[in-house]
Regions:
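Transmembrane helix-bundle core of multi-pass membrane transporters
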Residues: 6-11, 82, 90-150
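Hydrophobic alpha-helical transmembrane segments
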Residues: 13-18, 61-66, 91-92, 131-136, ...
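Alpha-helical transmembrane segments in multi-pass membrane proteins
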Residues: 15-24, 45, 49, 53, ...
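Short loop segments and helix-boundary regions at transmembrane helix junctions
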Residues: 28-111, 207-219, 236-239, 263-264
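Helix-loop-helix "hairpin" substructures at the membrane interface of multi-pass membrane proteins
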Residues: 130-202
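Transmembrane alpha-helical segments in multi-pass inner-membrane proteins
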Residues: 190, 194-245
Length: 269
């Protein structure tokens, strides 16, 4: 029986496609704006929301999304309004979120069977509700970028100049921070907290081997991310390993191969 006939694998493939679109768009902004460290902080801070959700018996993904968005706003507010150093603000919310998640996880009576899937990802845990959430986030991200594309590009490459042109820089930055948090949390079932940030950076690194145009990077990142996910999911199924690790391993192998091919082409050109 082909693995494509299994419902859980079909869900994983659809989830991978949606995640590739959302991460391809948001990841390009993150890399262009050099927000990788902030995104990593938000990713790990979201564990606080998972712990709270498990403890109070609510959907951990939804509570993680709320917690991640609030953490993103907190980092932005501390660094811009309170003038706390950005790396210090990130470290504060990163460590606080992880500590809250660990405390509530240990305070929850009984065993927490979903914990490894939240940390490392699992194709078996991607359900219909996760697909609906991913769909909603992907549509929202795509709509925002379609409506605010020129403004986002201006902010991504020169926020100071964008502000001098009376563009709503701060409002758009808060909106994009919220979208980053939502995108990260919506992919947790697939790649896990530990590796989620890689979905937002490695496809963009690979796309950068061939183009530097913002729109082209988005397009290539979506395709590359989709291929990475396909290979990773197949590897995860065959080797019975966490899908997150398999996807990121495949992504890095693809990046290294393409980098080597490009280097050889230029060498013998």
């Amino acid at each position: 029986m082909s693995i494509f006939q299994y419902t859980f694998f079909q869900n994983a493939l659809l989830g991978a496609l949606l995640a590739s679109v959302a991460c391809g768009i948001m990841g390009t902004y993150i890399v262009s704006r050099r927000l990788v460290f902030i995104s990593g902080g938000i990713t790990h801070a979201s564990f606080g929301g998972i712990g709270i959700g498990v403890f109070f018996g609510i959907n951990p993904i939804m509570s993680a999304m709320v917690y991640a968005v609030l953490s993103a706003f907190g980092v932005e507010w501390l660094s811009t309004k309170v003038k706390v150093r950005e790396d210090s603000a990130i470290a504060l919310f990163w460590t606080f979120g992880m500590s809250v998640g660990i405390l509530f996880s240990f305070l929850t009576p009984g065993f927490m069977p979903d914990l490894p899937s939240f940390l490392f990802g699992s194709i078996l845990t991607i359900g219909t509700s996760d697909l609906w959430l991913l769909s909603a986030v992907t549509v929202l991200v795509a709509l925002v970028f379609l409506l605010l594309y020129r403004t986002i590009i201006s902010i991504a490459f020169d926020a100071t100049f964008a502000q001098s042109q009376r563009l709503p820089v701060h409002a758009v930055e808060y909106l994009l921070m919220a979208l980053i948090a939502m995108t990260i949390v919506s992919t947790l079932r697939m790649v896990g907290i530990v590796l989620a940030i890689s979905m937002l950076t490695i496809p963009q690194m690979t796309a950068n081997l061939f183009t530097y145009r913002f729109g082209h990077i988005i397009f290539l990142s979506i395709i590359i991310g989709w291929v990475n996910c396909l290979m990773g999911l197949m590897l995860s199924y065959w080797l019975n390993v966490p899908s997150g690790a398999a996807i990121i391993f495949s992504a890095i192998i693809i990046y290294m191969l393409l980098w080597a091919i490009k280097s050889l082409v230029f060498k013998f050109k």
